[in-house]
Amino acid sequence: MISIERLSKTYPQGGLPMVALEEVSLEIPTGSVFGIVGRSGAGKSTLIRCLNLLERPTSGRIQVDGRELTTLSDRELRLQRQNIGMIFQNFHLLHSRNVWDNIAVGLEIIGMPKAQRQQRVAELLDLVGLSDKAYAFPSQLSGGQKQRVGIARALAAKPSYLLSDEATSALDPETTASILALLSDINRQLGLTIVLITHELDVVKSICDNAALLETGRVVETGAIADLLSDPLSRLGRSLLPTCGPLSVSATPRAELTFFDTLAASPVLSALAQQHAVGVTLLGGGVEFIGGQRVGRLHVDFNRPEGGLNLAEVLQFLNDRGVRAELI
């Protein structure tokens, strides 16, 4: 687990320091794909560079698996960084070396014997789908292939954590999808914890199971994707799964329904109609695949039965069956 406690980072700038991060606190669960989303200038890249002390924070604590990074000696920090791989937007490949050597260079630096190094590079090339490009040079690769080399290189020392700093922002949508699918596979196969910086909500939708929203150096909200989507006040949840748009004025009670994964709303609504004699009119909505699960959001009108409508019972009936219902 990565635990960040009251992390701040300021830069000297004339009379007043520039505040890049202010009192940031986060818990990143082991094995998760954690997205940190925000606009340009929000402090995302500064935060991720603090996680392996490429940027040293001005104050605060960073614990990785219980070890406080800011108190480590230079030697201890070098060893700790072997457990934290990192990929970047601009790949940072050595253009004078082929794919094989770009992956092997980090293993050479840490002194891995040649036979082990060769075996490890071959494993990584197979993992990222580049076995046929082992002796190609960066100039001969597409953007997606270059990023796959970057991923292989980041995984060379078998880290437990992978930091991704806008790693797909320079790629086209199709290539982005393939890189995200690869990262998702790596997360599942290796149990790797991935911390992913992005300004694109589609990236969070595609791969993340936890997320945080960063604005002007502060964490505005954070949580599991399912919890954010279930929270009617969550800005991130609303952005990931927008509402159905403006609706006409209605004289009947109206609700927003949110449901998850394999749960289908229609059988629940049918049961509601049968047990409570409530007519349900579907106004709009949709289903998307977010955070590895199907999520649906519907707007409905409840038509009053002859005997009247007990809204509290109706909402409780839906919530008891896993459909979050809120009057709108």
Curated annotation (Swiss-Prot):
Transmembrane portions of the chain: none
Family to which this protein belongs: Belongs to the ABC transporter superfamily. Methionine importer (TC 3.A.1.24) family.
Ranges of residues in domain ABC transporter: 2-241
Protein name as catalogued: Methionine import ATP-binding protein MetN 2
Any one Gene Ontology molecular-function term assigned to this protein's record: ATP hydrolysis activity
InterPro entries for the chain: AAA+_ATPase, ABC_transporter-like_ATP-bd, ABC_transporter-like_CS, ACT-like_dom_sf, MetN_ABC, MetN_ABC_transporter-like, NIL_domain, P-loop_NTPase
Pfam families tied to this protein: ABC_tran, NIL
Reactions the enzyme catalyzes: L-methionine(out) + ATP + H2O = L-methionine(in) + ADP + phosphate + H(+); D-methionine(out) + ATP + H2O = D-methionine(in) + ADP + phosphate + H(+)
Record bears the keyword Cell cycle: no
Binding site for ATP: G38, R39, S40, G41, A42, G43, K44, S45
Subunit structure: The complex is composed of two ATP-binding proteins (MetN), two transmembrane proteins (MetI) and a solute-binding protein (MetQ).
Disulfide bonds: none
E.C. designation(s): 7.4.2.11
Gene Ontology cellular-component terms listed: plasma membrane
Entry annotated with the keyword Lyase: no
Physiological role: Part of the ABC transporter complex MetNIQ involved in methionine import. Responsible for energy coupling to the transport system.
Location relative to the cell: Cell inner membrane
PROSITE patterns: ABC_TRANSPORTER_1, ABC_TRANSPORTER_2, METN
Membrane topology classification: Peripheral membrane protein
